[in-house]
Amino acid sequence: VPAASVIASRADRPITGETRPDLRNVAIVAHVDHGKTTLVDAMLRQSGAFAERAELVDRVMDSGELEREKGITILAKNTAIRRQTEDGPVTINVIDTPGHADFGGEVERGLAMVDGVVLLVDASEGPLPQTRFVLRKTLQAGLPVVLVVNKVDRPDARIAEVVEETHDLLLDLAGDIEDMDDAALDTMLSLPVVYASARAGKASLTQPADGGVPDSENLDPLFETLLTHVPAPHVDSTGPLRALVTNLDASNFLGRIALIRIHAGKLRKGQTVAWMREDGTTQSVRISELLVTEALTRVPAQEAGAGELVAIAGIPDITIGDTLADLENPEALPRITVDQPAISMTIGVNTSPMAGRGGGDKVTARLVKARLDQELIGNVSIKVLPTERPDTWEVQGRGELALAILVEQMRREGFELTVGKPQVVTRTIDGKLHEPFERLSIDSPEEHLGAITQLLASRKGRMEHMGGHGTGRIKLDYVLPARGLIGFRTDFLTETRGTGIANHVFEGYFPWAGEIRTRHSGSLVADRSGPITAYAMIQLADRGTFFVEPGAEVYEGMVVGENPRAEDLDINITKEKKLTNMRQSSADVMETLARPRKMDLEEALEFCSVDECVEVAPNAVRVRKTILDANARGKERSKMKSRDNAAG
């Protein structure tokens, strides 16, 4: 990647002799679950951001319901930590970016706002693929890095090895970046290392023993390292205003709020500025409200200067990447660029016979489209495209997780939807079909090596590296088509009995790898509507695993279970027992039935086969056939077969 074509290169920032020593803008980047949000909590507590007697909430920056539930950060958020130094107070603006590559658009936006990066790595797991993704973006932007080895008090910590692995990763990534001179390379590799335990709220510059606690009372060594190694923002405080919109938010009182970094000049409440849009047009607008961040809250301010991260209101249609400039002398800043989507799925209104009965109040195409348009405003890494049907849209994103999170958020908001199976977004390069590939990193007990190898061979995976810690666990690196990862998680957890860890990150576009069969079982499909009977389920118990319980309503074409054989089976699950004068307790009947397999949204999307989709409602997630009528399905299958034979 040429260092010139970076996200928000340091070359785009004002190069003047003037700096703001009272400011530091830092992003914390790490892999999912390496303790990033916990570290920010500890930094806030030790800077006195919470009142002594205030009730402390863990992981305060994960404010979204889904974020707390899944333990991952989805949106890039910022907080301001005030720190007293010998030279006076310093405000450290911390951007908490997602550690998951699926939310990469958030990572790129975060990097456009900062002058340095804290790379947080788990003392046992070391740098993982997602760390690689974020670090590559950081190096492209030419930002200095501070390495924080977190969780050093883990019993399985291997601190020295992890530091060495991080250095190797940096060297490897530096090789990918063109025109990087030796001085820049030396600076990058001589990065400072801080050893920390975020949960204990301690950090040290001296390496503790593996599993030991850092030898200081607090996080002061981390704060001092940040102030020394992250440069104060270079600013042009006397020049004309130039500010870049890096994120959006909404408020019930103020409407749309734009989060901006001021690169030059000053911004005042009530000021009229030039709003420079993506289409090249410029419009004069008034800043109705100016807000600055103090700890986790935004407070009104009258004025903000160059180098600061602030929020503004008063421009209803402003979007990410726009520039706010001086009216007399408008000059646009380079827009934020994000990687193209790799996975797509269709999202439309609920078209099943149970539509409107799933506890949702948002069931029309107009509402679905309005919600998807709203998502586009704040989420730069997704695209919404029309399909042949007026009530269905194709949504493209970075990965399966990002799209599943969007659908889950809509479900909780009261939407009833029909969601198609995730597909890959292909490209034609030099006349040949190319598809996205992913780099997959696996950590698993050694005894599952054979099963994992077999699983990935069937998904066109190519092993690139294999190693072990000498602890009975192995580390594998694979490169495989993104298609091969759709539905992979469930199979992988089954094969490793829940003990394996798998993480993946986008690698690039390569030639189409051929057919991949990710599911080797069929579906049990209801052939008529009605309530499920225990009698029918007992008669059909040997046919496979059920997803439903007696008494629930089904409709024709609904998938009620999994057939171990590789074909679909239409069954009558509503059949009633012929009445006799023999009596049987219903409790006895229930005991003979196996417990049904419950699937959440992600599992249902993974289970889906090509001719199936998922019905999503606030109180239910069901897999169903796209074509509900069994006869119509049979005709479509015959048509496909004859088409394949003709092509062959």
Feature map (PLM): residue ranges:
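A short, contiguous, amphipathic alpha-helix enriched in charged residues
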Residues: 352-376, 590, 594
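Acidic, low-complexity intrinsically disordered tails
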Residues: 1-16, 622, 628-648
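Interdomain boundary/hinge elements
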Residues: 56-58, 173-193, 233-244, 280-293, ...
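Residue-level signature of catalytic and energy-coupling elements of molecular machines
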Residues: 33, 39, 71, 94-96, ...
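Conserved structured catalytic cores and adjacent interaction surfaces
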Residues: 21-38, 101, 124-136, 142-155, ...
